[in-house]
């Protein structure tokens, strides 16, 4: 009898656990897309489509790197990695058109990044695997001197660590 009750509890609660898992995954995915869109918007909203994609690639490259957090929001909000996250200004997008574009790029990139990278073996990454970038008009970071420039896209220079 006890085994039967245990079995019934498992049968009744298993679908609820599965649904909760899907809901949590969906919420996590939405949060990551939002964080990616924020990063694209605040780091590159005045850049071309290619420039915005490049910022998205660096963000996603960090997600798959062992040296950074394993979620987009973790990467974006890692302490002092992106200037907009600690500049004291509002983190709410104000330019509606630029925000819509950043969201569209983020949704596309988040949904397709792993497939693009697997199929093309990284050839679709316009940043050539960069984990870092900076805008020379705004900064000349000392850490960049230790790295190799792999691309300049719009107003950003993209770098990889020297091996």
Located regions from the model:
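Positively charged n-region of N-terminal signal peptides that target proteins for export
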Residues: 1-4
